[in-house]
């Protein structure tokens, strides 16, 4: 029969082992960012890792476990209050006495993560590719235009020197095939707009050469 002293020693050992396991599971290391990382850096790292390890895209046996870990880290570090608690207290801020997450996280109970929601800020995916691409490029690349001042060539230039969208272009080209992208270094995406009440037919053309993206509106008609 175990004595109270042996039970106490056993409990201490379990606690120490749990702390060691949690200490080795550093959320910043999981996402590959420094502790001083900005919200944008954390989000960028999460997007990149989620694209790589999401079970719908990665069929390796450990992909789901890795994705859970990534999502758990992002769940904490993307929230300012939770991140502050984590930085001060560590994992114990979100665990019960048994070393389990105590906040009712969906990642603890079941695996239910919407891959489409992951890229809602970069809306280039989905069944209706043309509609989503149009929305994306109009939101991010096209300046508001007054109806009376539309011109045949309205140019906008953007530098993607290592920025977030540049990385997204590279990642998406590796994983997906777009009809709007050709095999050379020139990338062209076209979206079309029909203006009601007139016979004018306009399209938004976005071209990428190297690190420069040029967008213009091409209008034709009576």
UniProtKB/Swiss-Prot annotation:
Gene Ontology terms: biological process? B cell differentiation; ERAD pathway; negative regulation of IRE1-mediated unfolded protein response; positive regulation of immunoglobulin production; response to endoplasmic reticulum stress; response to unfolded protein
InterPro entries found in the cross-reference section: DnaJ_domain, DnaJ_domain_CS, Hsp70_co-chaperone_J-domain, J_dom_sf
Q: Write out the entry's keywords from A to Z.
A: Chaperone, Endoplasmic reticulum, Phosphoprotein, Signal, Unfolded protein response
List cellular component terms (GO): cytoplasm; endoplasmic reticulum; endoplasmic reticulum lumen; nucleolus
Q: Which domain of life is it from?
A: Eukaryota
Task: Give the principal location in a single coarse category.
Answer: endoplasmic reticulum
Q: Which residues carry this modification: Phosphoserine?
A: 133
- Which residue ranges does the record annotate as region Divergent targeting domain? 91-222
Q: Name one Pfam family in it.
A: DnaJ
In alphabetical order, the GO MF annotations are:
Hsp70 protein binding; misfolded protein binding; protein-folding chaperone binding
Q: Where is the signal peptide?
A: 1-23
Which cysteines pair up through disulfides? They are none
Localization, per the record, is: Endoplasmic reticulum lumen
Q: Which Gene3D superfamilies match?
A: DnaJ domain
Annotated J domain ranges read 26-90
Question: What the protein does?
Answer: Co-chaperone for Hsp70 protein HSPA5/BiP that acts as a key repressor of the ERN1/IRE1-mediated unfolded protein response (UPR). J domain-containing co-chaperones stimulate the ATPase activity of Hsp70 proteins and are required for efficient substrate recognition by Hsp70 proteins. In the unstressed endoplasmic reticulum, interacts with the luminal region of ERN1/IRE1 and selectively recruits HSPA5/BiP: HSPA5/BiP disrupts the dimerization of the active ERN1/IRE1 luminal region, thereby inactivating ERN1/IRE1.
Indicate the quaternary assembly.
Interacts with HSPA5/BiP; interaction is direct. Interacts with ERN1/IRE1 (via the luminal region). Interacts with DERL1.
- How are the domains described in the entry? The J domain stimulates the ATPase activity of HSPA5/BiP, while the divergent targeting domain is required for efficient substrate recognition by HSPA5/BiP. The divergent targeting domain specifically recognizes and binds to aggregation-prone sequences.
Q: What is the protein name for this chain?
A: DnaJ homolog subfamily B member 9
């Amino acid at each position: 029969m175990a004595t109270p002293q042996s039970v106490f020693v056993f409990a201490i050992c379990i606690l120490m082992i749990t702390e060691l396991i949690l200490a080795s599971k550093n959320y910043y290391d999981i996402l590959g960012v420094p502790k001083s990382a900005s919200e944008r850096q954390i989000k960028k790292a999460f997007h990149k890792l989620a694209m790589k390890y999401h079970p719908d895209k990665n069929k390796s046996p450990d992909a789901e476990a890795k994705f859970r870990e990534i999502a758990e880290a992002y769940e904490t570090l993307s929230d300012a209050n939770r991140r502050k608690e984590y930085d001060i207290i560590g994992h114990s801020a979100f665990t019960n006495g048994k070393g389990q997450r105590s906040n009712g996280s969906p990642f603890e109970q079941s695996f239910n993560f919407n891959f489409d929601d992951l890229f809602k800020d970069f809306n280039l995916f989905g069944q209706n590719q043309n509609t989503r691409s149009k929305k994306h490029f109009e939101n991010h690349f096209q300046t508001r235009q007054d109806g009376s001042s539309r011109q045949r060539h309205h140019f906008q230039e953007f530098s993607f020197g290592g920025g977030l969208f540049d990385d997204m272009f590279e990642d998406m080209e590796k994983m997906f095939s777009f009809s709007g992208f050709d095999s050379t270094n020139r990338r062209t995406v076209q979206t079309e707009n029909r203006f009601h009440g007139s016979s004018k037919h306009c399209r938004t053309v976005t071209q990428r050469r190297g690190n420069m993206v040029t967008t213009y509106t091409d209008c034709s008609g009576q």
